[in-house]
Amino acid sequence: METGNLTWVSDFVFLGLSQTRELQRFLFLMFLFVYITTVMGNILIIITVTSDSQLHTPMYFLLRNLAVLDLCFSSVTAPKMLVDLLSEKKTISYQGCMGQIFFFHFLGGAMVFFLSVMAFDRLIAISRPLRYVTVMNTQLWVGLVVATWVGGFVHSIVQLALMLPLPFCGPNILDNFYCDVPQVLRLACTDTSLLEFLKISNSGLLDVVWFFLLLMSYLFILVMLRSHPGEARRKAASTCTTHIIVVSMIFVPSIYLYARPFTPFPMDKLVSIGHTVMTPMLNPMIYTLRNQDMQAAVRRLGRHRLV
């Protein structure tokens, strides 16, 4: 497509993770295993929480929603990456690239807001244990979950609205395995310094502030636990520790990628793999391995299926 003297690109080319065919095959097998594990682990959480009446509490309904987010988030990048690892030419259309950016930031933004809801849930459970069920009623937690999805949608629309007007007239080589703002922005045929600043403010600083507030919230919760009896304190502390691990796994890579100037660094791809592929797989493992109620529910589900 031509406008004046500019030839607009119709697609982008990924450099991917490796140019060596043998290594690409190995990476395909490894990440196929990771993606299958991600899908099965998160589906297991969704089915377990849905089918086990003992888990029909706000905390586990929130955990189920997190599993849905993890499943969808990994599916934005992993299937395309797997196909490209077996392909000679790794391309994505302009429309596909913008779509990937939209869903990546939609689900990533929803994840950020959703982790705040989970922190709020734990705060109510520990500070007001006798009123927990009353405060965290169905209307409230459903409203909070809907708000997280709406928040992610608004965040993504802002990202996309800033990207769509940009002209892309070449080159079209992306040194990555998926479309994301930092890499695509560098290919625009115009000065993007102001836009880069707006992107860092919209994503990076939001991540930093949100991460700090969440850590302070969990620190406050852990301090409050000192007044609880032994067994209740141990169980609540284990749950909070799990949440802190998950929050750190999600926010630290995101801060690295978006809270700095969009200059490429050698670690970028490795951090992106952890952020987009590994974390969605590890989240269900962390929650099931550290949560005795989830472990018991999974065993009950297994026995029920065998009967």
From Swiss-Prot:
GO terms for molecular function: G protein-coupled receptor activity; olfactory receptor activity. CDD domains: 7tmA_OR4D-like (cd15936). Belongs to the G-protein coupled receptor 1 family. This is Olfactory receptor 4D2. It comes from Homo sapiens. Glycans are attached at N5. The chain crosses the membrane at residues 26-49, 58-79, 101-120, 140-158, 196-219, 236-258, 270-289. Signal peptide: none annotated. Its main location: membrane. The keyword Aminoacyl-tRNA synthetase does not apply. Residues 1-25, 80-100, 159-195, 259-269 are extracellular.
